Amino acid sequence: MEFILSVVGSLLLVICVLVSVAFLTLLERKVLGYIQIRKGPNKVGLMGIPQPFCDAIKLFTKEQTYPLLSNYLSYYISPIFSLFLSLIVWMCMPFFVKLYSFNLGGLFFLCCTSLGVYTVMVAGWSSNSNYALLGGLRAVAQTISYEVSLALIGFKILLFSLL
């Protein structure tokens, strides 16, 4: 019974995160509309609330294109794996009801966020383009340099919370 509740809680968390991201993009588009002195996406439905769902339908019905010489499977699996990793990170966050509580949650967070950058490199490599590969390697180098400072800040917070 506890396993079923944790699975239902995890699915509910993932759905809430995805819907909140959709409405944050709606908020971003409205703010950009006000900044640029134009009408934002508030023409669909009541105050533009159905706009994220219309955007999702549009994205799912678009034609899929891929580079001619690319490695098709890894080219399309890497963004899916990146989304999966970013949703898994939410599972270790401490909420009111603990979904998955374990002692090394901070280390799990750092590991999942560090794995996310390699999906960009795999996507660049699988496109068989030198420029995409260089972009992927540049993203890996940049993210690794930021992860060191993130880990040091996290360990500093952990150290001061134990004192």
From Swiss-Prot:
It holds the Pfam family NADHdh. It is a multi-pass membrane protein. GO terms for molecular function: NADH dehydrogenase (ubiquinone) activity. GO terms for cellular component: mitochondrial inner membrane. GO terms for biological process: aerobic respiration. It is an enzyme of class 7 (translocase). Belongs to the complex I subunit 1 family. Core subunit of the mitochondrial membrane respiratory chain NADH dehydrogenase (Complex I) that is believed to belong to the minimal assembly required for catalysis. Complex I functions in the transfer of electrons from NADH to the respiratory chain. The immediate electron acceptor for the enzyme is believed to be ubiquinone. This is NADH-ubiquinone oxidoreductase chain 1.
